[in-house]
């Protein structure tokens, strides 16, 4: 058995950053909706509430609009998981 740290996205903190950058840049939800040419603002509200993440394409657009990088938007955490196979033993073989 081995234990490794698996990177994950902190959805709640990422949602807060998405909303924070929008507010800091002075955009309304409707303006972001127009930039994406969405029929409704539901997706933006869902991103900002942490219901789900934007697609990678939409993250690229958000980063460009807000003048930041995708790494600035996404909050990364790690969780420890157990492996059935000890990958350290495999690497040395």
Identify the role of each PLM range.
Residues 1-24:
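A short, Lys/Arg-rich alpha-helix, primarily the initiator
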Residues 2-8, 64, 74-93:
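Short, charged recognition helix plus adjacent turn
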Residues 19, 30, 60:
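Residues within the helices of the helix-turn-helix
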Residues 22, 33, 63:
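The alpha-helix within a helix-turn-helix
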Residues 26-46:
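Short alpha-helical DNA-recognition segment
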Residues 47-48, 58:
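DNA major-groove recognition helix of helix-turn-helix
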Residues 57-72:
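DNA major-groove recognition helix of helix-turn-helix/homeodomain DNA-binding modules
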């Amino acid at each position: 058995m081995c234990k490794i740290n698996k990177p994950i996205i902190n959805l709640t903190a990422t949602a807060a950053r998405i909303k924070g950058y929008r507010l800091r840049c002075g955009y309304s939800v409707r303006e972001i909706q127009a930039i994406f040419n969405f029929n409704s603002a539901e997706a933006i509200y869902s991103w900002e509430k942490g219901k789900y993440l934007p697609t990678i394409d939409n993250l690229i657009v958000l980063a460009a609009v807000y003048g930041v990088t995708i790494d600035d938007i996404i909050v990364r955490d790690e969780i420890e998981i157990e492996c059935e196979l000890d990958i350290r033993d495999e690497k040395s073989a």
